[in-house]
Amino acid sequence: MPQSSAATARAQTRTEAAYSRWAPFYDLIFDLPFHPGRLAASRAAAAAAGKDGAMLVVGVGTGLELELLPADLRVTGVDISAAMLDVARERVARKGLRQVKSLQVMDAGAMDFADGQFDVALAPYVMSVVPNPARVLSETWRVIRPGGRMVVMNHFAAAGGPRAAIEAAMEKAAWWLGWHPKFPYAAVGDWIAAQPDAELIERRKLPPLRLFTLLVIGKRAQS
């Protein structure tokens, strides 16, 4: 295995371990602080999908987004953590979320879906988690149909000031946290700029404290 692939595999193993630790109490800690962004991203993705649209949720985790999505969608969720998906499945069963058609353990960087299978993809708080964001972006892009959209909700590191110093200090514990506090916007922005069929439709900061950013990226229809 090449060095880069080996490093990615090790990082992914650490991520799986981190979210196995988080799974039992993830919702208790991350539900309310992340809810405004989660709600905005879910609404943007649902609007893009339309009635009976096929939606992929990348990094679905414990499924906090699922109950925010309309019942007339056809939702598939993937996550690398089986422990997180166990919580999501229990949520779907308990709340009768009929829009959820499938929840699968899957590497977001190598998904078992056909090209253009989905109308829209929602990637909530996942790009600063995965070992190779560009690979996940490209793979998510592949499974969106031309004319579809990708909705990304994420934290991006501050350029300077006290918040940047805090993020730099927290980055030392990224292996334990399961995400990278010092995650630059360029990791996503440069990828968007490099795609000839991509258009950044919306970029909007959201509460709390404008810590999170919503991106809506359109995939141009083939001429």
Regions found by a protein language model. Give the residues of each.
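Class I SAM-dependent methyltransferase SAM/SAH-binding core
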Residues: 54-110
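Conserved class I S-adenosyl-L-methionine
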Residues: 2-50, 64-65, 87, 91-95, ...
